[in-house]
Regions:
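Active-site-proximal beta-strand elements of phosphoester/diester hydrolases
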Residues: 10-20, 111-123, 157
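Active-site beta-strand/loop signature of hydrolases that rely on acidic residues for catalysis
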Residues: 16-17, 32-50, 114, 143-166
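Structured beta-strand-rich core segments of catalytic domains in phosphoester-bond hydrolases
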Residues: 45-48, 52-124
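N-terminal, active-site-proximal structural segment of metallo-dependent hydrolase catalytic domains
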Residues: 2-62, 72-75
């Protein structure tokens, strides 16, 4: 009698807008112990790199890569895998806000590139913050388009600050003037998804 076994390698990747990593450290650690992700991408860490609480994550086996700033924004990627490469910020885009980190992980599946984003909110719209949001999205789209040419495992995740469709909110009418819901935001978001 023959038995055929298939071994399926699964990589568990999660994303979480923590709204201050230092305020939520115990919640994050509890969740990690429960869910055991291979990679956890955090947004809105709200801490400069030198003050990021590395030790609690390193003590449970995570490699930590951060791109932070004081009191606002910030992204971090925690990985059980060796992180071979880290890119802070979208290339060729002069941006002083810490909203993008890209990491390459040496996993059981081979190399995995992960783009962890915290897309700008953009309110009030119209205005400079909305213009910044749209420009950021277009720069992101261009970078992702170029990176996809590498034909490697590439995962894009994070907090997109977009309401893609009417069904994604209880009351679309309440959101009609919000940057997250404006047609131009949704259009560029769909362009990113269609890459």
């Amino acid at each position: 009698m023959w038995h055929i076994f298939f071994i399926v390698n699964i990589v568990k990747i999660a994303s979480w807008n923590v709204n201050s990593v230092r305020s939520r450290i115990s919640n994050i650690l509890d969740w990690i112990k429960l869910e055991k992700p291979d990679v956890l991408c955090l947004q809105e860490t709200k801490v400069v790199d030198n003050d990021f609480p590395l030790s609690p994550f390193e003590e449970i086996g995570y490699n930590v890569k951060t791109h932070g700033q004081k009191s606002y924004n910030g992204v971090a990627t925690l990985s059980k895998f060796l992180v071979e490469e880290t890119l802070n910020g979208i290339p060729n885009y002069d941006d002083d806000q810490a909203r993008y980190i890209e990491t390459v992980h040496s996993s059981d599946l081979g190399m995995i590139r992960i783009s962890n984003i915290y897309l700008p909110n953009g309110n009030p719209a119209p205005g400079p913050k909305y213009d910044y949001k749209l420009n950021w999205m277009k720069k992101l789209k261009n970078h992702l388009s170029e990176t996809l040419l590498n034909e490697e495992i590439f995962i894009v995740l994070g907090d997109f600050n977009v309401i893609p469709d009417d069904i994604d909110t209880y009351s679309p009418e309440d959101w009609k003037d919000d940057a997250l819901f404006k047609m131009e935001t949704r259009k560029v978001y769909r362009e990113i998804l269609s890459l």
